[in-house]
């Protein structure tokens, strides 16, 4: 009887250990990633089957703005997000005392200038009005486009990652940059034709049916440091599921798919086999 009791006890203990281990495994193999609708969620949907083969059940939660994804990540509502670039993440952490980190850089979305009135930045008239989103971390990108076109110069020592419109030294056409709009509204403002030119992030341009490489009158170069990334809470970048997610997103096959689908509007960053 004692022997039978011992066997039963051992069996129950082994089963408990198995169930406990299985629960931990399941917790790490199902991840929820918050993302912008395009191209981020589209890219994630593309890699879902591959991740399934890797034992990862990927759930995607789509956000339509740049505010909620980091709040949801910080609150533990999602495991990671995919919508922002490095300067935006740094700025958010600074303003919100956050500890979110970059788990891997995936792609670049060149920011572009669009106009229904003019074919190039150099054709903009004196006293032109340009609409820009209120994302402070993108101001340097906008300024560089206008600087490269010879329309403005910047004060000595200006760093693009922290630049604002107050850093403009000379503005030979007296261009007014109105930067009070939510990023997601920029395509509608472009369609309204209110301004002489409108600056739009490529994800919102693509969502609106625009083709950045064809429709933009000025487009950020591939060498831009503003790579879109997978963000996680500090420490989670070491989770096996997150590592697998980043590896699949940076694989050559995924990046080939990105190049073919977006035709230069979205540019892969680096690659892994």
PLM features: what roles do these ranges have?
Residues 28-38, 56-62, 129-130:
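Short, well-ordered beta-strand elements
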Residues 38, 65-66, 76, 80-90, ...:
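Beta->alpha turn/N-cap motifs
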Residues 103-152, 255:
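A conserved helix-loop-strand patch within extracytoplasmic ligand-binding domains
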Residues 1-26:
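Sec-dependent N-terminal signal peptides of Gram-positive bacterial secreted proteins and lipoproteins
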Residues 33, 73-74, 189-191:
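Hydrophobic residues within well-ordered alpha-helices
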Residues 105-115, 140-147, 206-246, 249-273:
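Periplasmic-binding protein-like
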Residues 61-71, 158-188:
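Short helix-initiation/N-cap motifs at beta->coil->alpha
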């Amino acid at each position: 009887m004692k022997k039978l009791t011992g066997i039963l006890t051992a069996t129950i203990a082994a089963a408990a250990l198995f169930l406990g281990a299985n629960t931990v495994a399941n917790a790490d193999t199902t991840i929820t990633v918050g993302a912008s609708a395009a191209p981020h969620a589209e890219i994630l949907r593309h890699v879902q089957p591959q991740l399934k083969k890797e034992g990862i059940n990927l759930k995607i939660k789509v956000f339509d703005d740049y505010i909620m994804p980091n709040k949801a990540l910080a609150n533990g509502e999602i495991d990671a997000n995919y919508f922002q670039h490095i300067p935006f993440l740094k700025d958010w952490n600074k303003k919100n005392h956050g500890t979110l980190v970059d788990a891997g850089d995936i792609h670049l979305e060149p920011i572009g200038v669009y106009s229904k009135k003019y074919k190039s930045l150099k054709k903009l008239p004196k006293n032109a009005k340009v609409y820009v989103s209120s994302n402070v971390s993108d101001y340097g990108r906008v300024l560089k486009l206008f600087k490269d076109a010879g329309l403005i110069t910047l004060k000595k020592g200006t760093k693009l990652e922290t630049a604002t419109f107050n850093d403009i030294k000379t503005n030979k056409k007296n261009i007014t940059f109105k930067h009070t709009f939510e990023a997601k509204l920029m395509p509608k403002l472009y369609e309204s034709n209110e301004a002489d030119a409108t600056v739009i992030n490529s994800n919102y341009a693509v969502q609106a049916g625009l083709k950045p490489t064809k429709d933009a009158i000025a487009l950020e170069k591939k060498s831009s440091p503003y790579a879109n990334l997978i963000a996680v809470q500090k420490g989670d970048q070491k989770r096996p599921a997150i590592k697998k997610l980043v590896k699949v997103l940076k694989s050559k096959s995924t990046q080939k798919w990105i190049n073919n689908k977006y035709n230069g509007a979205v540019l892969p960053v680096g690659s892994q086999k």
